[in-house]
């Protein structure tokens, strides 16, 4: 069903069949990573935005080379802390440098696995450094979003071929 959901979403935005395959592969890898690193099942819900009432955080990373893809997760502070804690194995109680480092390392691991998989299909790719900013909302012509539901809360997964248009003035930097 993931392939069908992705195909339908991408067709409405004019992406071609080749792009369906590599985006679908990313989403499936992301869901497997949720099981492995977050110890939870994740359900994707297409075309349904998530009203994130409290301050939100966006962690994103761009991949370049043979294929270009930028991915990001937009989440509440509580979801960020839950993900960072599950990944690091330590209890995270506040959004600070340690929590941000954990969530960015999770992005590095997931996206690193993806580019290794893509190299197996003769698509050499590289990773930019992950970034996290407060109150960031990805924008751009080809950005599409999936709502991800987990036992520790919901968040948005954004994907784009061309990158996100963002105001990075709220970028965390330690």
What are these regions (language model features)?
Residues 1-174:
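N-terminal auxiliary interaction/assembly segments of multi-subunit proteins
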């Amino acid at each position: 069903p993931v392939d069908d959901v992705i195909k339908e979403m991408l067709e409405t935005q004019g992406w071609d069949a080749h792009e369906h395959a590599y985006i679908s592969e990313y989403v499936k890898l992301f869901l497997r990573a949720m099981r492995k690193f977050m110890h939870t099942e994740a359900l994707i819900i297409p075309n349904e935005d998530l009203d994130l009432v409290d301050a939100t955080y966006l962690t994103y990373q761009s991949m370049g080379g043979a294929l270009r893809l930028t991915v990001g997760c937009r989440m509440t502070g509580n979801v960020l802390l839950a993900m960072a804690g599950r990944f690091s194995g330590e209890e995270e109680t506040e959004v600070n440098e340690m929590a941000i480092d954990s969530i960015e390392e999770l992005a590095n691991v997931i996206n690193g696995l993806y580019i290794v998989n893509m190299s197996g299909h003769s698509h050499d790719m590289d990773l930019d450094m992950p970034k996290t900013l407060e109150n960031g909302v990805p924008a751009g012509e080809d950005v599409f979003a999936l709502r991800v539901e987990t036992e520790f809360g919901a968040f948005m997964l954004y994907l784009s071929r061309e990158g996100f248009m963002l105001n990075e003035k709220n970028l965390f930097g330690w």
